[in-house]
Amino acid sequence: MNDAVKLERRATRRQRQAEATQAEIVAAATRLFFERGYMATTVEAIAAEAGVALQTIYNAIGSKRAVLSRVLDFAAAGPDAPAPVPVFMARRTAEIHDAAGFARLLADWFAEVAPRVAPVFRVIREAAAVDPEAAELDRQRAAQRLRNYAEGVAAMQRRGIAAGKATDELAAAIWSIGYPETYRMLVIEQGWSAERYRSWVEASLSAVFLAARPEEVRHPE
């Protein structure tokens, strides 16, 4: 075995160890954030729960706010994620050929991801009410989701789907309909079934994608 192969294997081993350590930290932080809330959870407590040194958290992820952001990333991606969310969603979007299919894809995705991320968003929103750093994280992640939706819409429009409609307005519609708080209010608070929620998301997005713009509506003379 030559030196290059040995170095590559060592690098791969170190990367896997780093990923495993991050996963342990995120799992520990998730448990504590859910049990105690963000404000009552210290980085020291996360380190103790994860069984790692305090400095390991700062080296592997960063501040407590960064840990909370990573908790959201892990929740969104789900277990054994094949790729970051924007990457595998772009792959799924590439297989869609019409507005109905786009609405169905998003409805399937929101129904899949909402149960995982809604509890994390509750932690973020509660923390944002009293902590400036958590509030900034909330704003940043909201803006990031809106940008991701706009990129997805633009990609579909380049293929002639929902073309002629305002990209930012369609992205805003996806953002609001698929917002985790909407899931929480309908499913957790109002008792909707998961299938009813998914069907509502699909119908709502289909109506948005297929609706005519105001200047396209013809009034009878």
Explain the meaning of each model-derived region:
Residues 1-20, 213-221:
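N-terminal intrinsically disordered/low-complexity leader segments
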Residues 38, 126-131, 177:
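Short helix-capping/turn signature of helix-turn-helix
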Residues 156-204, 212-221:
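Hydrophobic/aromatic-rich alpha-helical bundle segments in the mid-to-C-terminal region
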Residues 64-66, 70, 80-115, 171:
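Hydrophobic alpha-helical connector segments
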Residues 44-45, 56, 60, 64, ...:
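Ligand-binding pocket scaffold of soluble enzyme catalytic domains
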Residues 24, 28-66, 70:
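Helix-turn-helix
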Residues 108-125, 132-159, 168-172, 199, ...:
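Amphipathic alpha-helical packing segments from all-alpha helical-bundle domains
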